[in-house]
Amino acid sequence: DFDSIVERKHTHSTKWLKFSDPNIIPMWIADMDFACPKEITDPMRERVDQGIFGYTDTPDELTQILKDRIKLRSGWDIEEEWVVWVPGAVVALNLACKTALAPGEIVVTPSPIYAPFDDASENMARGMVKNFLIDNNGRMELDFDATEELLSKDTKMLFFCNPHNPGGTVFN
């Protein structure tokens, strides 16, 4: 719904709290000012109305839906045990650094990138090298030659954001 205005300035919104100047339109964070669709809010209301917020398991069918989507989009048939559900991308980035890298090992991170990608290796006391994106007619792209030059015996992981944030480049 692009026509309804949702006032968020007094809701502790990170986006709107950053700048006090009312003439600044904050576009520094991927936080949209659109109302959430009823298909999402109605089931949430049902859960709230139930009045109990105990522990919840991830529905088995959700993993199968993910497997089917990956197979459809990429032809890759993943194993169910490869899927680990986490509460968000930032948690996943930190877990990836902690579990896939030993101390002293390095992740290659495109730059610029959403800050939590940069933060994850530091949070987990792992190494990082930046692979600076190149401008190709206004489109931010990976420099594959530079990526190859950054590889070493200690490089064990490449962070990848698709679509890329910032810039919006969709890699395929």
Language-model region placement:
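N-terminal small-domain helix-loop-helix segment of the aminotransferase-like
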Residues: D1-G88, L95
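Conserved core of the PLP fold type I
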Residues: F53-N172
